[in-house]
Design a protein with these regions (language model features):
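Short alpha-helix capping/helix-loop boundary micro-motifs
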Residues: 44, 57, 123-127
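Bacterial N-terminal signal peptides
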Residues: 7-15
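Sec/Tat signal peptide C-region and signal peptidase I cleavage site
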Residues: 16-20
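Positively charged n-region of N-terminal signal peptides that target proteins for export
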Residues: 1-4
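Chymotrypsin/trypsin-fold serine protease catalytic domain
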Residues: 106-187, 227-228, 234-241
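Conserved catalytic-core segment of clan PA serine endopeptidases
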Residues: 22-31, 65, 70-120, 126-131, ...
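A mature extracytoplasmic/lumenal domain signature
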Residues: 43, 51, 61-63, 76, ...
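C-terminal subregion of chymotrypsin/trypsin-like serine protease catalytic domains
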Residues: 21, 28-37, 45-46, 50-65, ...
Length: 252
């Protein structure tokens, strides 16, 4: 009962439409945003996920660790939040929490199986980034996280932002920055609650989900948000995602 009360409190915190992604991400309810969902945990955390099948949500492993209960928050046509039960959580077997916390590459990928289909949403097509990934390649991130670090009430509605690859992007990890600020001063980027959010790349047939948001920093690598956005690309994990989802009966 106590865990359920915590989940309800977290859902109500996110019930009022606000913003997500620091630095001015664009509010969006259509397009890629229609696949975005909110994940709440009984320990009070909240993260972002993507619907990839009517009963399957893709997110990051560090958001859905064992020892807690998780639910999906969905808003009806009148905006009232509802909690949907999660039947099963599958975490990639190669995920390493210490590596993620140190911003090193790891299999930060997980799937949630819902008890019932989530209606009124779109599903995202799962793919992989175009290889080789070039510095300056453009990606679109989406999330329900906070716009003000440390202020949970500033999160809750889906926002999207266009970022570009920096550093040495590859199949293990992609680091994204605001193309205007280049990570050296406050800019657009992921923040608390955006973890697990989808990273899209435009393909000939439309946007494809090619990665998930794992971590963020402030400018110049400082603690915070608005600097780097760390992404786990799905290149090495797409097969595991498809196999796991199909073992649950999902058609991908």
């Amino acid at each position: 009962m106590k865990k359920l009360a915590t989940l309800i409190a977290a859902a109500l915190l996110l019930a009022t439409p606000a913003h997500a992604i620091v630095g001015g991400g664009t509010p969006q309810a259509d397009g890629v945003a229609r696949a975005v969902v909110t994940i709440v945990g009984s320990r009070g955390n909240f993260c972002t996920g993507s619907l990839i099948a009517p009963k399957v949500v893709l997110t990051v492993a560090h958001c859905v660790q064992p020892g807690a209960d998780y639910k999906i928050v969905d808003r009806g046509a009148d905006g009232t939040p509802q909690l949907l039960n999660v039947r099963t959580v599958a975490i990639h077997p190669n995920f390493n929490m210490q590596a993620m916390q140190a911003h090193r590459a790891t299999a930060d990928v997980a799937l949630l199986q819902l008890e019932i289909p989530l209606k009124g949403k779109s599903t995202a097509l799962v793919g992989a980034p175009t290889i080789p990934i070039q510095v300056g390649s453009r990606f679109v991130i989406a999330g329900i996280g906070v716009t003000v670090r440390g202020n949970g009430k500033s999160g809750g509605a889906t926002r999207v932002a266009g970022l570009v690859a920096t550093g040495q992007p590859g199949t293990f990890q992609i680091r994204l920055v605001d193309p205007v600020t280049n990570g050296v001063r406050d800019g657009i980027g992921a923040c608390t609650g955006d973890s697990g959010g989808p990273v899209f790349e435009d393909k000939p047939n439309g946007p494809v989900l090619v990665g998930v948001i794992s971590w963020s920093t402030g400018p110049n690598g400082a603690a915070g948000c608005g600097g780097l956005t760390g992404v786990t690309p799905l290149t090495l994990y797409r097969d595991w995602i498809l196999q796991t989802a199909r073992s649950w009966g999902a058609a991908l």
